[in-house]
């Protein structure tokens, strides 16, 4: 196994450009299946503003949302600050989440609940379903795969959040802690 210093360094050039991110947020409002639109916006913002992984987003509970921060239960519990946009999108989502939770006899504690009509409405959005809706949305938004990679929104959005944190002047150590992106701490990484 190579030592930590020998691991390839992922450049922030993989970050989604600001214009593309704003375009995605606009396209989320035009997604053909209207009941997915609010959830898509939450998903995009938690990836692109907060820097979470899709798994971390799918595992969030409603009680993890604080006024200005978010508790993330990954390999380690951590508290991540929320941008004003993330706070706004989450405050818009929470009333709809409560409505969806009311469709189940015993409401689930998860933050993201399935909005699609049917017997599964109000059940937690799992990792597979979160990846599926992101893939469907990428097709709708016209996001093209680069090289042999499939069109993946999650990693460029996550790097966009990292770039935002660094531009705001937060230390790399703090950003690595918030996002769980340990490669920020490797020697030779240039932000």
Please annotate each region the language model reported.
Residues 33, 132-181:
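Short, basic (Lys/Arg/His-rich) helix/loop patches that form interaction surfaces
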Residues 1-26, 75, 116-123:
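Flexible interdomain linker/hinge and immediately adjacent N-terminus
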Residues 46-59, 168-170, 179-181:
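A short, glycine-centered helix-capping/turn motif at helix boundaries
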Residues 64-67, 170-190:
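Short, polar N-cap/turn motifs at the start of nucleic acid-interacting alpha helices
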Residues 1-4, 51-55, 137:
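N-terminal DNA-binding recognition helix of tyrosine site-specific recombinases/integrases
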Residues 20-54, 158:
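Basic, Lys/Arg- and aromatic-enriched nucleic-acid-binding interface segment
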Residues 50, 55, 59-91:
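Conserved tyrosine-mediated DNA breakage-rejoining catalytic core shared by Y-recombinases
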Residues 74-120:
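Basic, alpha-helical nucleic-acid-contacting "clamp/cap" segments
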């Amino acid at each position: 196994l190579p030592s930590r210093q020998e691991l390839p360094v992922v450049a922030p050039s993989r970050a989604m450009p600001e214009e593309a991110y704003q375009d995605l947020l606009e396209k989320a409002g035009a997604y053909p299946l209207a009941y997915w639109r609010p959830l898509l916006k939450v998903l995009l913002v938690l990836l692109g503003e907060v820097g979470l992984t899709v798994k971390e987003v799918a595992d969030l509970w409603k009680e993890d949302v604080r006024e200005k921060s978010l508790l993330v239960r990954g390999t380690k519990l951590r508290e991540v600050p929320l941008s004003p946009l993330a706070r706004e999108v989450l405050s818009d989502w929470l009333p709809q989440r409560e409505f969806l939770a009311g469709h189940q006899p015993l409401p689930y504690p998860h933050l993201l609940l399935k909005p699609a009509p049917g017997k599964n409405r109000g059940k937690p959005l799992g990792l597979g379903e979160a990846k599926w809706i992101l893939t469907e949305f990428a097709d709708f938004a016209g996001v093209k795969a680069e090289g042999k990679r499939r069109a993946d929104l999650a990693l460029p959005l996550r790097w966009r959040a990292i770039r935002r944190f660094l531009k705001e002047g937060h230390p790399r150590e703090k950003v690595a802690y918030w996002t769980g992106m340990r490669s920020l701490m490797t020697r030779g990484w240039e932000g």
